Amino acid sequence: MSTRDSARFSSLPLRASASITVSGLDPPLADTSRLCKLAFAMPSSPRPVRQRLTSVLSLILLCSLLPGSSFASAYNGRPKLIVVLVIDQFRGDYLERYRDQFGDSGFRFLLDHGAYFPNCNYNYANTSTAPGHSTLFTGAYSNGHGIVANEWWDQKKKKMVTSVEDDDTKLVGVAGDKPGASPHNLMGDTLGDELKLATQGKSRVFGLSLKDRGAVFPAGFAGDAAYWIDQQSGAWVTSTYYRNELPSWVQDFNSTRPAKYWDRDWKDAQGALLASTAHRKAKDGSGAGFYEVVGPTGFGNAYEFEFAKELVLYENVGRGPATDLLSISLSPNDMLGHQVGPDSPEMKQMALDLDRQIAEFINFLGHQIGLADVWIVLSADHGVASLPDAVKKLRIPAANLDARKLEAQINGAITAKFSAGHPAAYVKLEYPRAWLDEDAFAAVHIREHDAEAAVGEAMKQAGLRDYYTKSQLAEGEAPDTPMGHKYLNSYSPEGSWYVMGVPDLYTVGSSKGTDHASPYTYDTHVPLAFYGLPFQAGTYRTSVEPVDLVPTLASLLGINAPTHSVGRVLTEALAPAHHTTGPGEAKP
């Protein structure tokens, strides 16, 4: 049974003819049906009882005169806009760790006035950016949507390729003839795709991120646009999959906005310097670029939100005849977290900065659209391990492993077994997963099952705890345990032969810093929160999964869940309702 904290109705943003400042926000007031609910949830005050009763009775009288103002129908109709905030590498414990230091209008606004699920965990081992975003927007795990990693071995090209690169498309927004990106590797459709189908294309769907994969998968197959940045210049780009040229507003943004973020000092609340972009800039095209310099600072998230606001304004997002969907994948947390770990002062400051930036964006949405017409969802694609050096100080086993040395060790073991005296690159290791070159094994007459088993044993000898081969997972050969199920959910039939290594606790495949991509809670635990009129405010301590996000939204929208969705509708957090408008149609 869920535990629900009491909701503080008194500070919910509203929308009417007057203007009320609430919890540091000043959005236009919400619809009058929410105002009627407040008549029965007004906080105590020092005013005389008679005066307070008069105010309440006046509100009740007002409600009785309003059409369609019954309390149970407070959220009749669809929202004009759904915003999904995906914070890259944001562990589920961060919200509780820093809750007392957050303001009232950012994270705490969503937690206090939304449905908050603090016990949300991915039920698979592929805890990386591409699989995480795919899972959030398809409602499926890798065995459904097909995305198992950020990149993998392409047997035809004989090289590693990214999850979204598409040679049939071109990049738009930068000089040259570079390959573009698309969701062509997805095996299932997304929430945005189903929204498009239900509204005959009237809904508009956008994805943005500093990373291509963080923008492309949320936008889905039918998305109107996905935008990410050119890593050198910071300019926003897209792909010919979506359009052949950038809109004029994006071109204007690129001509002036990136320059604002160079030459800036990132400081903590006491004014102490955390990082300076001034000494690392490379505006001339040489050396470190925008992604590396500005990305892993609090300015990276500010840059994304600035672009998101422009997109809402110039594309009239939330102002069409049907519900629009906007995904904002905030990449800087991941870019910084790999370097300094989750317990560093820098990560704390980024969380505090992000709290303020989210508050500003919520305020923006309130003014532009009205929060009564907006649903906001907060989650993350994965967590991260603490720095192994810090873990070891507490006598907990941990290690930094050099993935390239491990790869050489595994290839050496396979060479000794199958082609002694004739070294070959049998394996490409993307820790903890090994991709096998099928041609190399074919040259020594080794079949898939035997090749994968040999690589798995070599991985154990190199220091991994255990392994699962692609062949094993295809046959469902995994223990009937929670951990076994995680690896079955991590399987995909697509791509070349592979072996999934099971890492030891707090053991990462980088010689310094930290990483993710494990089945352990520090990687699987992420936040999940919903804000909007359909959601009963409170904290729900049931165990939930990120796959529950899209079926919950789809049910409320009256549309089909994505084709491979396996999640459940989080009914415990939903308010009752009388009737609705048509599927996906925004209320007038």
Specify the residue positions occupied by each region the protein language model found.
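Low-acidity, Ser/Thr- and Arg-rich intrinsically disordered low-complexity segments
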Residues: 2-11, 15-19, 23, 33-36, ...
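Bacterial N-terminal signal peptides
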Residues: 55-68
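Beta-strand elements within well-structured catalytic alpha/beta cores of enzymes
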Residues: 79-91, 110, 136, 195, ...
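Short, structured active-site-proximal loop/turn typified by the sulfatase FGly-forming signature C/S-X-P-X-R
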Residues: 95-144, 204-208
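Secreted, luminal/periplasmic, and some membrane-associated catalytic domains
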Residues: 102, 119, 145, 150-180, ...
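Active-site His/acidic residue clusters
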Residues: 216-225, 284-292, 296, 311-312, ...
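Long, well-ordered, tryptophan-enriched scaffold segments
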Residues: 223-307
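Substrate-binding rim/cap in mid-to-C-terminal beta-strand-loop elements of soluble/periplasmic
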Residues: 393, 401-445, 515-557, 571-580
